[in-house]
Amino acid sequence: MENAQLLVKGAPASPGLGHGRVVIIKDAKENDLVKEGDILVTEMTTPDFVPAMKRAAAIVTDKGGRTCHAAIVSRELGVPCIVGAMKASAILKTGQEVTVDATNGKVYDGNVDIKSEKSVTASKYAKTKTNLYVILADPNLVPKIAAMPVDGVGLLRAEFIIAHIGEHPHAMLDAGRGKEFTEKLADGIRTFTKAFYPRQVVYRTSDFKTNEYRNLKGGEKYEPIEENPMIGYRGAFRQLDDAEVFRLETDALRMVAKEYDNLRVMIPFVRTPEELAKVKKVLDEAGVGGHRLWIMVEVPSTVILLDDFLDVGVDGVSIGSNDLTQLTLGTDRDSAKFAELFDERNPAVMWSLERIITTCKKRGVTVSICGQAPSFYPDLTEKLVSWGINSISVTSDMILKTRDIIGDVEKKMGILP
C-alpha cells in the first residue's frame, strides 16, 4: 500500500473495493464492452447504463456528486463507486488494471491490497416508531432486500423497469406492441408487490427526462432536445400531455392492483394543484385511483402551496430531498463543482422540510422522505423525527445504519424505551 501509485481521486459515492480491467465507454450504446468484473469508467451515467453497471466490479465517473444517478444506483446495486473524478476517463486507459477504493475515493494502479472495514451485520433495533422504507428498482435484489428489517418500499422507480424493457414506449406502440410493454411493466411491478406483501410498495410513475428517454431504442424519433431536461418535459405534465404512453402505465398498475392491495401510486414532479387534479382524474378513470395516491414534493411551488395540493386529495407525500435541495438552492446536484453548496441542512431547505412535515401532520396525511440525507446527517434525522415524519426511505446499503440512527434518536426523545 505504501508504494501504491495513486492515479485518480474523486468523491466516495458507494463504499467498497473493486479490482479489475478498466473499460472506458462514452455512452450506453457501448454497454456490451463492459464485461463481468470490469471497472466501468465514463463521464456520467444515465438509467440506460444500468446493465453495464450491474456487471462492473466498480464504477468511476468524471462528473457528479453524491446524489447523481451513478451514486444513487451504485449504492442500490452494492457496486463500489467514485464520482466527480474529473479527468478519470482521460487519465485511465482501457485495459489498464486498477484498484478502486471507493470508500476513500481513490483509484490506484494495479492490484493493491487494501483492508476494508467490517460492515455492520445487524441493527440494534428490531422496530422503530418511524417506519424505515427502502428505495429500490432492481428486481434481482428483491429477495435479498425483502428479507431485511424494512417496513416496505418507499420508492419503486419505474425508470429501472422501463430501461430493462429497453425500447421507447412510443416505438412499441407504433409497432403494435403496446400490450407487450404494459405486460412487461406489470411483471416488473408485480415482482416487488409479491415479495414485500403485505408491506406497502410505493410505485413512482415514470419520470424519465427527455435526454434519458432518447437513449432508449427508438427514442430519438420521439424526444425533443432540451437545454435543461431537469426542469423540462417530465413528471405530471408529461403524463397528461403524453396520454397514450401514460395509459400503458396505468393499465399495468390496474393489472397489479387487482392482485396486490399493497400497491401505492405516486406522481412525480408535480408543479401545480390543477395539474395534480387532472392526473388524479386520469387515474380514477383508469381504475387505479383507489390505490392510495401519493405525490412527490420536490418543486418549491409544491412546498409553498402544499395545502392546495392536499385539498385535491392525496393519501401520502414523499419529499424528494435531492431535487428539492437543488431547486431551492439553485445548485446542480450532478455537478462536482457545486458539491459543497448542495446541503440539505441549509436553512432554506430545513424550513421547507419542517413546513412539509408539520402541514401533513396537521392534515392527517402520511409524510415520508426519500434520499440519502438522513443516513449522512443524524442531526437532520433527529429534526425529521421531532417534526413528526412517518417514515424515511433509503437505499439498501443504508438500511441498518439508518435504522440505528432512527432508534438512537427515538430513544433520546423518549419514544423508545
Language model feature labels by segment:
Residues 2-156, 166:
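Acidic, glycine-rich flexible loop/linker segments
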Residues 123-417:
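Conserved alpha/beta-domain cores
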